Amino acid sequence: MKIALISDTHIPMSLHRLPDQLLKQIVGVDAIFHAGDITSSSVLDVLAKIAPVTAVAGNSDPPEVESKLADRELIQLEGHTIGLKHGHQPHELQINYIGQPYDSPEMELFFQLMTAQLPGAEIIVFGHFHRSVIMHWNGVLFINPGAVAATNGSCSFAMLELGASVNVQIIPLSSCD
């Protein structure tokens, strides 16, 4: 099973529409997971024409988008439990993890929180940071596909293949507009 992992599209605030390169590269996938900051339900409509979409709300999603989505999802596919959550945490936690390296103590706390919020997940897909990563932490595979609407000049998505083994690849987009 092939799943496109997308996050942080920020349409129409940062992009007017999904990049053609992205849309061409995800044709034929079995499912699409969007890890939040969609900001326009039209994004989900476009993606749903390609494959079934599972999406979660992000911190930038307006009420009309957020009200249609869960904060997190636990999905069973091909014998794997996949957690999907944007990654923003309650403000009262006061964690300074934005901009921190993924191997920092602040991110260690973030990974602990995400694991607790998505119990039983073997794979956790998240967004929010606009920085891609594929890493294992305490037996859980964490994947941030990066942002489709990048603020740092690079944009990307990821492809996850599930079967007897799990394979994931970050795919850079040549243009973020």
Model-derived segments and spans:
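Residues at the starts of beta-strands that form the adenosine-phosphate
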Residues: K2, D30-A31, P52, N167
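Conserved catalytic scaffold of divalent metal-dependent phosphoesterases
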Residues: L5-R17, K24-Q25, F33, I38-L141
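Binuclear metal-dependent phosphoesterase catalytic core
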Residues: I6, L15, Q76-E78, H136-N138, ...
